[in-house]
């Protein structure tokens, strides 16, 4: 089964153009989760797997592992993709997971920062950041707030793809798709300040450590969490994705159309964008009031 998985992962990289982070997630879900479970049931070949095995695995994830519906849905999606690949590659006649419905995921109220909390976060960084990382950490926060970049897009941003004179950056989205993003005045100012203090580095990345090394995703998460904590901002979600969320929310609050937000955020589907946007009761009322005939 490992050989089939290796070919599948190669397919995701070469033909689908998935990021290394996404490919790694698929690998972990199947290699460390599904395959050991199947082996314990005496199943060692992909042709031996039946629908009951997949159902049993989902039950195991629920009862034994305590996985949430979100986690189980993600793992099932990875399993379906794996077996779909084998069917399309004529290595299997049918996908044993095809008819299994994804666990129902309860909708949650969106978590986002208010305008005042955004200001408080930035002011906290100005007053409490260490001098050697202050300009860089400020640039990271401002760029996340003003462009809504994913962490991987930020850490992979190349120095050569930052054009402060034109006020734009070129980033690589999911699926290795390139996109140019405009920078507003605050973002240009923050990136310029950081550029003046940026250490020499050979890796070509825009954001680097104090010794010129690559910045990890984990480090960026820790940076955002630290300053949120110092600012006294407590949210259920407290990582960089919270800043991506407020980017979409603020655009919506400023009257930007959903399809424009979709393009700026790099979402594949408008449904994804709508999950970031909280439609207030006041907005619903105002929208319906516009339908009155005035009689």
Protein language model annotation of sequence segments:
Residues 1-295:
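Conserved catalytic core of the tyrosine transesterase superfamily
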């Amino acid at each position: 089964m490992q050989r089939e998985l290796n070919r599948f992962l190669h397919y995701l990289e070469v033909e689908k153009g998935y990021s290394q982070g996404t490919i790694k997630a698929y690998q972990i879900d199947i290699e460390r989760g599904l395959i050991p479970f199947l082996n314990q049931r005496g199943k060692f070949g992909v042709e031996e797997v039946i629908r009951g095995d997949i159902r049993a695995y989902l039950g195991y994830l629920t009862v034994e592992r305590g996985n949430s519906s979100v986690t189980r849905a993600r793992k099932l999606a990875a399993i379906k993709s794996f077996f779909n690949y084998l069917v399309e590659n004529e290595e299997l006649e049918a996908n044993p997971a095809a008819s299994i419905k994804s666990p129902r995921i309860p909708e949650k109220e969106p978590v986002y920062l208010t305008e005042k909390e955004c200001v408080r976060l930035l002011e906290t960084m100005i007053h409490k950041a260490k001098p050697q990382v202050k300009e860089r950490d400020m640039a990271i926060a401002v760029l996340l707030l003003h462009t809504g970049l994913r962490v991987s897009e930020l850490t992979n941003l190349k120095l050569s793809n930052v054009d402060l004179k034109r006020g734009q950056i070129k980033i690589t989205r999911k699926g290795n798709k390139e996109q140019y993003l405009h920078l507003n005045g605050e973002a240009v100012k923050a990136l310029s300040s950081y550029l003046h203090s940026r250490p020499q580095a050979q890796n070509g990345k825009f954001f680097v450590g104090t010794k010129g090394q690559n910045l990890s995703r984990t480090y960026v998460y820790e940076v955002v969490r630290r300053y949120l904590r110092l600012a006294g901002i407590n949210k259920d979600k407290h990582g960089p994705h919270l800043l991506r969320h407020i980017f979409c929310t603020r655009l919506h609050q400023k009257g930007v159309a959903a399809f424009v937000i979709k393009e700026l955020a790099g979402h594949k589907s408008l449904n994804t964008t709508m999950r970031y946007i909280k439609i207030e009761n006041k907005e619903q009322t105002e929208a319906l009031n516009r339908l009155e005939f005035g009689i």
